[in-house]
């Protein structure tokens, strides 16, 4: 998630479905030919856990970060988490690990654990590349590439705690900690950043919430993000890494993404996490609840009215978009000419009966029933909490 409006982390939407309520009476709209459909909605994201706009609204009302988190994750306890985390760097789509030369750069052979200082030989770049023989080699570039050493295992670059600049097809970016080659169970070579948990957070928090927001809100975000990372560390995505760097997990931008105010929030909450049953909680969060959070897969992610989300600075508390009926007909061609939209299930919370669980589109060729999440995704809507007006 980046900047305002704060985006939600897509993988944070993973949760078990709740038992939906029946649709509200009158949740049926007849669609004439060439109709314009106004879709009015509340919120942005899945609605589970902390609303980021709600956290800022609560901070503006004087709530501390601990009280903000207590509201959005009721029943959790406080604990600590430290150590390292390993992060997939998705921007590096190559098989090689390529970095800019810098003072103090070393390489470690992961098979034997030996760490070797790289010489000051005029190199501009260093890389670990695998040959056709399956052997990893360390190479350096002056005017051309030169071989330096062969490795028994994979390679890992480290600069004594100073940032290392990774070169990728998407551009250069600096990272704290170690950059290594990882190999997944499928045999894919990936680039992995291994670093201290709180240093990782410094590259997450300003991309998940504006660092300029109230300190209490940013601190709440730091704890929620730390807890989520600690949870993922216990449930790693791969044998090669524990968490990814996109909105499928938490957006992570490395050292280049850091900002002083968000670093302060990480430092002020150092090591603090929320626990459930003695383990890091599954602290989902999203941009805006729209005024009601949605029930998640665990008791500390309840559906509840959110009085903090609707402050004047939240542009996605209530929103609307207009689409022609042809958009829906092209998205679901099995319907033919669209004649009716009928919401069949909602979650029962808030305006219009709450978030849509399922709806049916009927037309001249047939009808299609889709989930609220599918409807939202295919139309690019901000949430499933919507209603319609036809003109």
Predicted regions mapped to residue ranges:
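Conserved, single-site charged/polar hotspot
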Residues: 2-391
